[in-house]
Curated annotation (Swiss-Prot):
PANTHER family on file: SIGNAL-REGULATORY PROTEIN BETA
Residues carrying a glycan: N92, N167, N179, N204, N210, N246, N270, N292, N311, N319, N344, N365, N368
Phylogenetic placement of the source organism: Eukaryota, Metazoa, Chordata, Craniata, Vertebrata
Organism (species): Bos taurus
Motif residue range(s): SH2-binding: 432-435, 455-458, 472-475, 498-501
Region (Disordered): 136-159, 344-364, 402-468, 480-506
Protein name from the UniProt record: Tyrosine-protein phosphatase non-receptor type substrate 1
Domain (Ig-like C1-type) ranges: 148-248, 255-348
GO cellular component: plasma membrane
Length: 506
């Protein structure tokens, strides 16, 4: 059973009402003035984020596109149009394919401080001569809050010594908004800034800051630091940004010299040059002997002190006996390209060393003279020794001669005590051991009958082979044997008695 259809007469009034309502709405939209609505007067985003700019219209009439611009006037910057070439960073918020779409909001990604400015949503009307600007929205001010760049510190271009004042400069840029604070510190102690400026002074998309402070250097500043701290709203209460400068790149601590001498083995003297508390460690040390360069050494081994400075020690061994006069030793140091500094040590030579020339390193002539002196000395010593030996031997011989020499005494003892008679021919020889007393020999009596010769033969022991000596014979006694005296009527001829002494020589 089919449902009952409405009567044709009843539908006609309903259709008329719908057409009337439709005509009324269309007339309102078409005849009313088009409005371009930008609800946000200002939008603030951080650099690197995405900004959304809203724009809607109240009517699609007149026919024409919607375009976005930054700024006003002839120099305004074209930002976006749906029907134009694509824009990498700008996209449409609404669905562009939707019929009767009246939302023309856009999104700008990866915002930078350069994107800051006033953006306008503008309605154009299509005409024969082209698109003509019809209506513009009030504009939306886009502000970009950008973090400041890390502070950069710069100091003096040349090194300075302690007790000098040097300037340090801190710079940071690219931040927005303009308000920013900057502080200086040295080793945790705040320093006052001598000058600080934020540029530009007028409104701009980003700003930069420049600040200067003065630092008084000290000897212990090798490990010191100068710090610049920057605080900005974009840091959202986090730690401030810091820039650091190490004073080790700025300071130069000149060395102090100490030179001492101490005796070593033999005639050696060890001269020490102590180079203390210098920085940086670029150093060259030279030894001078009486103003003449003796040795140069580039320091390679250092002793680092707690304050960051360095020490170096150099030794110079001197043979004091090689010098007849005082020696001036100079320790000369060139540090970090600066003029050389030096210190002297005078090595005194004692008086005996001044009078002799034995400690000198011998040259060719000195060596010859030394050899000659040695030979002459040895020869003289031998001659003296021989002379002493000769004198000694002569003295011994004289002493022996005095002790062993005695007078040869010939005497004639009594005939009745010891008598030995040998009857021989007229020329017989009698040998006897003689020890004659002093005095004159008795004269033979004239009444002796025989004329004969009597001898005393004395032989001495052979002397030692090594000595040339005279041997004196000690004659104990001589017995002259004669025949008994015969009385004669007349005197007999005289006879002689001899003592024969034989001496053997070498």
């Amino acid at each position: 059973m089919e449902p009952a259809r409405p009567a044709p007469g009843r539908l006609r009034p309903l259709l008329c009402l719908l057409l009337a309502a439709s005509n009324a709405w269309t007339g309102t939209a078409g005849d009313g003035e088009l409005q371009v609505i930008q609800p946000e007067r200002s939008v603030s985003v951080a650099a690197g984020e995405t900004a959304t700019l809203h724009c809607t219209v109240t009517s699609l009439s007149p026919v024409g596109p919607i375009k976005w611009f930054k700024g006003t006037g002839p120099g305004r910057e074209f930002i976006y149009s749906q029907k134009e070439a694509p824009f990498p960073r700008v996209t449409n918020v609404s669905d562009a394919t939707k019929r009767n779409n009246m939302d023309f909001s856009i999104r700008i990604s990866n915002i930078t401080p350069a994107d800051a400015g006033v953006y306008y949503c503008v309605k154009f009307r299509k005409e024969e001569r082209g698109d003509m600007e019809f209506k513009s929205g009030p504009g939306t001010h886009l502000t970009v809050s950008a973090k400041p760049s890390p502070p950069v510190l710069s100091g003096p271009t040349v090194r300075a010594t302690p007790e000098q004042t040097v300037n340090f400069t801190c710079t940071s840029h690219g931040f927005s908004p303009r308000n920013i604070s900057l502080k200086w510190f040295k080793n945790g102690n705040e320093l006052s800034a001598s000058q600080t400026s934020v540029d530009p002074e007028d409104n701009n998309v980003s700003y930069s800051i420049n600040s200067t402070t003065k630092v008084l250097l000290a000897t212990g500043d090798v490990h010191s630091q100068v710090i610049c701290e920057v605080a900005h709203v974009t840091l959202q209460g986090g730690p401030p940004l810091r820039g650091t400068a190490n004073l080790s790149e700025t300071i130069r601590v000149p060395p102090t010299l100490e030179i001492t001498g101490s005796p070593s083995a033999g005639n050696q003297v060890n001269v020490t040059c102590q180079v203390n508390k210098f920085y940086p460690r670029h150093l060259q040390l030279t030894w001078l002997e009486n103003g003449n360069m003796s040795r140069t050494e580039a320091a390679s081994v250092f002793v680092e002190n707690k304050d960051g400075t360095f020490n170096q020690t150099s030794w110079f061994l001197v043979n004091s006996s090689a010098h007849r006069e005082a020696v001036v030793l100079t320790c000369q140091v060139e540090h970090d390209g600066q003029p050389a500094v030096s210190k002297n040590h005078t090595l005194e030579v004692s008086a005996p060393q001044k009078d002799q020339d034995t400690g000198q390193t011998p040259g060719p002539n000195d060596s010859n003279w030394t050899s000659i002196f040695i030979v002459v000395g040895v020869v003289c010593a031998l001659l003296v020794a021989l002379l002493i030996a000769a004198l000694y031997l002569l003295r011994i011989r004289q002493n022996k001669a005095k002790g062993s020499t005695s007078s040869t005494r010939l005497h004639e003892p009594e005939k009745n005590t010891r008598e030995t008679t040998q009857i021989q021919d007229n020329n017989d020889i009698t040998y006897a051991d003689l020890n004659l007393p002093k005095g004159k020999k008795s004269t033979p009596k004239a009444n002796e009958p025989n004329n004969h010769t009597e001898y005393a033969s004395i032989q001495a022991r052979p002397p030692p082979v090594s000595e040339d000596t005279l041997t004196y014979a000690d004659l104990d006694m001589v017995h002259l044997n004669r025949t008994p005296k015969q009385p004669a009527p007349k005197p007999e001829p005289s006879y002689s008695e001899y003592a024969s002494v034989q001496v053997q020589r070498k």
